[in-house]
């Protein structure tokens, strides 16, 4: 079972990042008029901000997670290079940046107004292949000091010897994670994990026309390139962790998108830090997905702290973020993950129109039968068919929010669309596949919907007593006088 308390112990992670470093510069201000010189908006700059970018952003993400981070890359002997070094020192990143007299530090300047990026200005050189040899030599001297290597490829020349770097790390017993830029994934042969986004996956020949096609082509790519695992980032579709024999999908966990800049850096930094600290690959991927959801709600190339990650993980684990209700598919994925972690899933259902003490006591009893409680909740249309035209008193959204606030409830999933046949939770029970099916009232097991399915699959059915004198109908009559 995933222990979130371990997120307080990431100081044990030691990660060497090697790749193309750059300086991210932001000009931020307001826009309220069009220039008289050309049909373009005028931004009145209120403030500027400089941040470590590219591979250096990966390193700073590791440092903000409390991991030990080092960055190896190339900069120019210039003002931006010195500024980048100073930024990394402030963020507690050990920098091994090789200076070139005849090159300039890569920088990307973004003009931002009202949380929108309006234009980006790139100033960059591609470093000569000969300099990659200098990087390779310093890498050989550093590699023994770290247990995980992250290769952050932006195709600027730092990683011209990438194959040699990977082989040296694997020979030394290190995990190697690669954020690829090349269309030829075989350049990263021997990597432990590769983390392409959907565009990079397609550019490398991946087929994303369907989930089955994606899995098939991803596995073929892993086999052809000699790579162990792929963590495919799929934007609003979440992430997919794929090996030659298994796969896991993690739905996107984003409440608000402000800026996607650097989200891929956060993913590989979080994954590398957690793997370095001894986390299971699947747990590390799930948490990396949550980290991406946190960072895209921030402006620019941002970072995530262990406290933010732990808080988001605990919220998403039981879907209790205020005002947030995951989709049915998201909830089912969370439930499946909990079951894989050895947790006992309990299911019950009802209308729960006006929540009262009888409901609360019953739900607490149901939760006590296992580790996680799933509540199937009749839709408004379903309640109306079952209880009459004046019901429900409270809308589905309100009922979901009230139930989700209870400590004993982990997931609330609505059911019962526009047909009478769906007024029972039978199909939902089959999808949840609980170890325990709980029902309150004077029932016999053979009259409980879904009981036969649960028992056939090794589960049990529990009939719980109701609280005398407590009912929604009684409350409504009492209010009406």
From Swiss-Prot:
Alphabetically list the UniProt keywords: ATP-binding, Carbohydrate metabolism, Kinase, Multifunctional enzyme, Nucleotide-binding, Nucleotidyltransferase, Transferase
- Which molecular function term from Gene Ontology is one that the record holds? ATP binding
Among the entry's GO cellular component annotations, what is one? cytosol
Entry keyword Acetylation: no
Which portions of the sequence form the region Ribokinase? 1-320
Kindly list the positions annotated as binding ATP: 197-200
Active site (record annotation): 265
Give the matching SUPFAM superfamilies: Nucleotidylyl transferase (SSF52374), Ribokinase-like (SSF53613)
**What ranges does the record give for the region Cytidylyltransferase, renumbered to this chain?**
347-481
NCBIfam families the record matches: cyt_tran_rel, PRK11316.1, rfaE_dom_I, rfaE_dom_II
Quaternary arrangement and interactors, per the entry?
Homodimer.
What job does the chain carry out? Catalyzes the ADP transfer from ATP to D-glycero-beta-D-manno-heptose 1-phosphate, yielding ADP-D-glycero-beta-D-manno-heptose.
> Which family is it part of?
In the N-terminal section; belongs to the carbohydrate kinase PfkB family. In the C-terminal section; belongs to the cytidylyltransferase family.
Question: What PANTHER family does the database record attribute to this sequence?
Answer: BIFUNCTIONAL PROTEIN HLDE (PTHR46969:SF1)
What is the name of this protein?
Bifunctional protein HldE
Q: Which gene encodes it?
A: hldE
């Amino acid at each position: 079972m995933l222990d979130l308390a371990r997120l307080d112990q990431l100081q044990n992670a030691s990660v060497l990042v090697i790749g193309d470093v750059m300086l991210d510069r932001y000009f931020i201000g307001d826009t309220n008029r069009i220039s008289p010189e050309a049909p373009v908006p005028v931004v009145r700059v209120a403030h500027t901000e400089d941040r470590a970018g590219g591979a250096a952003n990966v390193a700073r993400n590791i440092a903000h997670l409390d991991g030990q981070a080092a960055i190896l890359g190339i900069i120019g002997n210039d003002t931006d290079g010195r500024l980048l070094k100073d930024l990394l020192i402030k963020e507690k990143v050990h920098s091994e940046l090789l200076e070139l007299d005849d090159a300039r530090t890569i920088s990307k300047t973004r003009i931002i107004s009202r949380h929108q990026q309006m234009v980006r200005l790139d100033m960059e050189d591609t470093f000569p292949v000969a300099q990659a040899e200098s990087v390779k030599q310093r890498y050989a001297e550093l590699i023994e000091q770290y247990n995980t290597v992250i290769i952050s490829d932006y195709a600027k020349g730092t990683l011209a010897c990438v194959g040699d770097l990977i082989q040296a790390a694997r020979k030394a017993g290190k995990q190697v994670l690669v954020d690829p830029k090349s269309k030829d994934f075989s350049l990263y042969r021997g990597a432990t994990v590769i983390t392409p986004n959907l565009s990079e996956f397609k550019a490398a020949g991946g087929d994303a026309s369907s989930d089955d096609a994606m899995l098939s082509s991803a596995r073929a790519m892993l086999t052809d390139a000699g790579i162990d695992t792929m963590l495919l980032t799929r934007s609003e579709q979440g992430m997919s962790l794929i090996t030659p024999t298994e796969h896991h999908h993690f739905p996107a966990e984003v409440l608000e998108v402000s800026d996607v800049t650097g989200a891929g850096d956060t993913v590989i930094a979080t994954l590398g830090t957690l793997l370095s600290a001894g986390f299971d690959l699947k747990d590390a991927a799930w948490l990396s997905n949550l980290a991406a959801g946190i960072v895209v709600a921030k402006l620019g190339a941002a970072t995530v702290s262990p406290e933010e990650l732990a808080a988001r993980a605990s919220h998403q684990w039981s879907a209790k973020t205020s005002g947030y209700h995951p989709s049915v598919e998201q909830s089912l994925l969370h439930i499946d993950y909990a079951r894989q972690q050895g947790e006992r899933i309990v299911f019950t259902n009802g209308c729960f129109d006006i929540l009262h003490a009888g409901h609360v006591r019953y739900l607490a009893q149901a939760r006590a039968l296992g580790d996680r409680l799933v509540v199937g909740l009749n839709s408004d249309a379903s309640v109306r068919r079952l209880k009459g035209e004046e019901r429900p008193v409270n809308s589905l959204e309100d009922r979901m929010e009230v139930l989700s606030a209870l400590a004993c409830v982990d997931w609330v999933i609505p059911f019962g669309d526009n047909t009478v046949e769906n007024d029972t939770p039978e199909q939902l029970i089959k999808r949840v596949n609980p170890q325990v099916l709980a029902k309150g009232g004077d029932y016999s097991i053979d009259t409980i919907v879904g009981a036969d399915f649960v028992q056939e699959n090794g589960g049990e059915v529990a009939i719980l007593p109701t609280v005398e004198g407590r009912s929604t109908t009684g409350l409504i009559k009492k209010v009406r006088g």
